[in-house]
Every structure is written in structure tokens, then in C-alpha cells.
UniProtKB/Swiss-Prot annotation:
Gene name, Swiss-Prot/TrEMBL: mdh
Organism per entry: Picrophilus torridus (strain ATCC 700027 / DSM 9790 / JCM 10055 / NBRC 100828 / KAW 2/3)
Protein's GO biological process: lactate metabolic process; tricarboxylic acid cycle
PANTHER family reported in the protein's UniProt record: L-2-HYDROXYCARBOXYLATE DEHYDROGENASE (NAD(P)(+)), L-LACTATE DEHYDROGENASE
Name of protein: Malate dehydrogenase
GO molecular function term, any single one: L-lactate dehydrogenase activity
Amino acid sequence: MARSKISVIGAGAVGATVAQTLAIRQTGDIYIFDIVDGLAEGKALDILEGAPHWGYDLDIKGFCTADESKYAEMKGSDVIVVTAGLARKPGMSRDDLLLKNIGIMKSVGEAIKKYSPESKIVVVTNPADIMAYAIYKASGISPERIIGLGGSLDSTRFRTFLAQELNVSFEDVNAFVIGGHGDDMVPFIRYSNVSGIPIEDLLPREKIDEIVKRTRFGGGEIVNLYKTGSAFYAPGISIAVMVESIVNDRKRVIPCAAYITGEHSKTYLVNNLFIGVPIKIGKNGVEKIYDLKFNEDELEAWKKSVESVKKNSAIADDYFAKNQ
């Protein structure tokens, strides 16, 4: 049986961690792309040289997309992971960064449309819901084949902090976060449990609120500790889990940024936009969107997240209208 093929666009710390994790788990052949000369090729060779120890007999190759024709090498990819993008620099506003990364997504989306339009796409570049929308606009790919990282990473942070506080196994904690990052995230505390025991029966509300706050700023905590960069291990692993669920048709239920339309719009208060919600991920991409019932506090938090997504999606719409 032919091996799966996964392309990773962006050879920075997150992209390289995704590639290495997928290689170790022998998920499929891995093709890495980056605009910086030698970076993708170097990361690919570095990962490949670990094969004798870990025993992954895979094709692992890197390509420089300064020559855009090199994108042709992603043809036939089962999954394309998009991590390419700029980091915010001093003096750069959030809107400036958003526009620059939307421009990058436009270029990447057009390349996907040209060379590998049948692939499933996992979008990582922040903010993932808006970048997924930009990839959709640029590529014209069916939206159920596009998934943004969304709440997958926030959820694993939430689960980690709960497990640490309770001194229990990480895998016994079930909890998830929907919506956007930071202030826009919506942790579903009512659905959080340890092997079925509700979190609210195990921790006082004050402690839960502390953990929620830490989760909201989990990325910033890492940035403050690193001082020279942002998180890449946990994001890389979160992405690899999503890719494996597609490639191996595992039907994992994970909160991710998905395209909301039709009946789901009534629940989630958006239409024809991407936002973080619980989805089932399988060989076809987004195979099911789960509608949630909000209580009053959750609904208020959700509306805030929705407004942020609508605002930023409008910026993307305006960009594409001006850059046809």
C-alpha cells in the first residue's frame, strides 16, 4: 500500500516539530517547503538523519519556494500543513501583521489550488481561524477540507493545567476550549471532567478560574520564558494529532477552526466563516460539526469571540477584494 504524503509549508520551529513528530510516528512521507534558501532542505536532512535510530523508512525532502515552481513537489499530498507566516515585530500593529499573513496565505492558497487541489489542509498560522478563511478564499477548496488549529492547542493546555492541579494522569482529563485565542477563548467547564467526574466537583470555582486565566495566556507564558520565541513543541504535537486523524481516518473529536454554515449558523451565530468548534476529523477532513448548548455566561463569552472573528474576517474580505 502506498504511503501517505504530508507537505509542511513553513520550516520554522513549529513546522519542523510537526515534521519530526510525523516522521517518528511513521505517518507518511514528508515534504517541507520554505521561502528561505536552505532552511527546508536542512530541516529535512536533519530529521532524515535520525531515521537509523528511530527506524522510519520514509521520504523526507525539503524545497525552497523562492522558486515558486518548487510548490509542484506537493502534488498528490494527502494533507498540507500551513505554518508559514511572519511573527509580530516591534512597531507592527496587529492589523499590519494580520494583513501581511493574509497576503502569505493568498500566495500559499493559490499554489495549493494549482498543484494539489485535492488535499486536506491544516492551517496553523495565527490567527488560525482567519488564516483558514484566507486559504479558503485563495484556493477555492471545499471548506470541509480546510481545518484551522483553533482550540486544539488551548484545550491541551487546559487539560495539562487541570491534571497538574489535581495530580492525576494527563490522559484522564477531558476538557476543551472553543472560539479564538486569549480573551476570545471559551473554555467549556461544564463538559470538563476526570474520567467522568465533573471538574466542578473536584475543584473550587476560584481555582478553576485561575486555571482558565492561565490557559488564556498560556502562549504568552511560554513567550515570556523563552524570551526569543514562542511555543512549538505542544503546537507541533497538536497538529500531528490532527494530521494522523485525517491520514488514518481515526475520527478524532477535537476543537478546531471549521467553516460554519447552514444549520450550524443558528448555534454558533456566524455564517460562512471559520471559528473554533468541536469537530470530527477523518479522511475527508471535517466530517461532523457538533452543536453545543450554551448557558448564559458561555453565550456571552462566545459572542465576544464571534465579534472578533467577524471583524478580522472582514479585513480578509477587504484584502481579497483589493488584491484579485
